[in-house]
């Protein structure tokens, strides 16, 4: 079993949270649990970004971790970015595309909470296919 933890902190300190990850084996889905506090009411996009460096207010986090040139989508869609995890405040997700092992592991990458709801790639424009129109980064 592989376990990991991500501590989220917003740029102003108001948004904070902790996400816990568990994967029973290389082929098992990843279980995510946790909670984010300090968010405005409503849904907020939640993504794994490609790089782990968030020292420049998350600007260096780049786009969501993607595989095989897929576009942005929802967590239950077959063709999606690996890091597309939908909308959160309280986290209880089991995901078959994430892994904590091997070259596609999300360990060492940045988790980002966005200011708006994620439209899951169904917003009908180019930005929707890249980011889900989830807006700025809160943490």
Curated annotation (Swiss-Prot):
<feature type="binding site">
    <location>
        <position position="72"/>
    </location>
    <ligand>
        <name>Zn(2+)</name>
    </ligand>
</feature>
<feature type="binding site">
    <location>
        <position position="49"/>
    </location>
    <ligand>
        <name>Cu cation</name>
    </ligand>
</feature>
<feature type="region of interest" description="Disordered">
    <location>
        <begin position="118"/>
        <end position="139"/>
    </location>
</feature>
<dbReference type="GO" id="GO:0005634">
    <property type="term" value="C:nucleus"/>
</dbReference>
<comment type="similarity">
    <text>Belongs to the Cu-Zn superoxide dismutase family.</text>
</comment>
<comment type="function">
    <text>Destroys radicals which are normally produced within the cells and which are toxic to biological systems.</text>
</comment>
<keyword id="KW-0186">Copper</keyword>
<feature type="binding site">
    <location>
        <position position="81"/>
    </location>
    <ligand>
        <name>Zn(2+)</name>
    </ligand>
</feature>
<protein>
    <recommendedName>
        <fullName>Superoxide dismutase [Cu-Zn]</fullName>
        <ecNumber>1.15.1.1</ecNumber>
    </recommendedName>
</protein>
<keyword id="KW-0479">Metal-binding</keyword>
<keyword id="KW-0963">Cytoplasm</keyword>
<keyword id="KW-0564">Palmitate</keyword>
<keyword id="KW-0862">Zinc</keyword>
<feature type="lipid moiety-binding region" description="S-palmitoyl cysteine">
    <location>
        <position position="6"/>
    </location>
</feature>
<keyword id="KW-0449">Lipoprotein</keyword>
<feature type="binding site">
    <location>
        <position position="84"/>
    </location>
    <ligand>
        <name>Zn(2+)</name>
    </ligand>
</feature>
<dbReference type="InterPro" id="IPR036423">
    <property type="entry name" value="SOD-like_Cu/Zn_dom_sf"/>
</dbReference>
<keyword id="KW-0560">Oxidoreductase</keyword>
<keyword id="KW-0539">Nucleus</keyword>
<dbReference type="Pfam" id="PF00080">
    <property type="entry name" value="Sod_Cu"/>
</dbReference>
<dbReference type="InterPro" id="IPR001424">
    <property type="entry name" value="SOD_Cu_Zn_dom"/>
</dbReference>
<comment type="subunit">
    <text>Homodimer.</text>
</comment>
<dbReference type="GO" id="GO:0005507">
    <property type="term" value="F:copper ion binding"/>
</dbReference>
<dbReference type="InterPro" id="IPR024134">
    <property type="entry name" value="SOD_Cu/Zn_/chaperone"/>
</dbReference>
<dbReference type="InterPro" id="IPR018152">
    <property type="entry name" value="SOD_Cu/Zn_BS"/>
</dbReference>
<feature type="binding site">
    <location>
        <position position="47"/>
    </location>
    <ligand>
        <name>Cu cation</name>
    </ligand>
</feature>
<dbReference type="GO" id="GO:0005737">
    <property type="term" value="C:cytoplasm"/>
</dbReference>
<feature type="binding site">
    <location>
        <position position="114"/>
    </location>
    <ligand>
        <name>Cu cation</name>
    </ligand>
</feature>
<feature type="compositionally biased region" description="Basic and acidic residues">
    <location>
        <begin position="118"/>
        <end position="129"/>
    </location>
</feature>
<keyword id="KW-0049">Antioxidant</keyword>
<dbReference type="GO" id="GO:0004784">
    <property type="term" value="F:superoxide dismutase activity"/>
</dbReference>
